[in-house]
Design a protein with these regions (language model features):
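Glycine/small-residue-rich interface belts in oligomeric ring/scaffold proteins
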Residues: 35-85
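Active-site helix-to-loop segments that bind/position phosphate- or nucleotide-bearing substrates
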Residues: 2-5, 9-12, 59, 71-303
Length: 303
């Protein structure tokens, strides 16, 4: 499996050279085999990217994350329908019943709140709020009709970052929000790459239904992985003023962090891949035996 996340800052040009990414920067050239790469994060508004490289990125199912002048991810380029049975997958996806989708969302939401509870326990936060999240996850109905996910998130963020904290996605965000937004965007890009690689159409979600969002399914499935970013931001950015380059690199490198998936220890990227595979098996065959999500407290960098 491809594993490398390449972070390119202030380069002049990125192009293809013999199935390698070639980066030209300050009179020097750097090459990375495309077969090793899962994601490229590009910063710097003057970078030129050739069409031949973009075509090769699609062929190798490599996601390209583009950042603005404030270093915030603003776009994702990824392959579409690269799976050898894309039409079969699409037909299956369009035939998912509402009951199947509601049950899948119930499972995903359970994993998300379970990880939020785990994060609060890791940082020895209020036992009352930890118990409240535990109650919320047990109350989740198919389709989360009572919005336990929304209630849990409010309790979670207020407890983790303080009652004055408000989640915002605007560019004027404080360093905590900027870190969360950056990390979530990287996770989203990786999930989009994996979802497309398995022939799933990101437009057709199990819960999200925004007609303007091509990543509805991606946004559904990535929910239990957001807490990996939350832990890193809490550990590293609470006393910082700006989201400096070294912190952006750290957030990007979260995809390579080691975490437990079932009985196996693997990278976050591999865990995401296994998770999507398990989701497909569950929703297609009603077999939940492989549909797991890693628990955040098993992250090895904190041990």
């Amino acid at each position: 499996m491809t594993w490398r996340v390449v972070h390119v800052s202030q380069s002049e040009k990125m192009r293809l050279k013999l199935d390698n990414l070639l980066v030209q920067k300050m009179g020097q050239e750097f090459t990375v085999p495309l077969s090793d790469i899962s994601i490229i994060v590009a910063e710097g508004g003057d970078t030129v990217v050739t069409l031949r490289l973009l075509s090769a990125l699609s062929k190798y199912n490599i996601a390209l994350v583009v950042c603005d002048n404030e270093h915030l991810p603003t776009g994702i380029y990824h392959s579409q329908n690269g799976h050898f049975r894309a039409y079969k997958r699409l037909k299956e996806q369009m035939n998912w019943s509402q009951k199947q989708k509601d049950k899948a969302w119930q499972i995903v939401t359970y994993y998300k709140i379970n990880n939020q509870e785990d994060v609060l326990a890791m940082f020895e936060k209020s036992l009352d709020n930890i118990r409240l999240l535990s109650d919320y996850k047990e109350q989740i109905e198919p389709g989360d009709r009572t919005n336990r996910e929304g209630h849990a998130s409010k309790v979670y963020f207020n407890e983790l970052f303080g009652k004055q904290f408000v989640r915002v996605t605007q560019q004027e965000a404080d360093v905590i929000n900027a870190g969360l937004n950056y990390g979530y965007a990287i996770m989203r890009a990786q999930m989009a790459r994996i979802v497309a690689g398995y022939g799933l159409n990101g437009l057709l979600g199990i819960f999200h239904k925004n007609e303007y969002n091509q990543f509805n399914l991606v946004d559904d499935l990535m929910e239990p992985f957001r807490q990996i970013v939350d832990v890193w931001v809490y550990d590293n950015l609470r006393d910082q003023e700006f989201l400096k380059y070294e912190y952006r690199l750290g957030l990007t490198d979260l995809l390579n962090a080691k975490i437990k998936y079932g009985k196996e220890t693997c990278s976050v990227t591999v865990a995401m891949d296994k998770y999507v595979k398990g989701f497909i098996k569950y929703i297609s065959e009603k077999d939940s035996s492989k549909f797991h999500c890693p628990v955040v407290s098993s992250l090895e960098w904190r041990k």
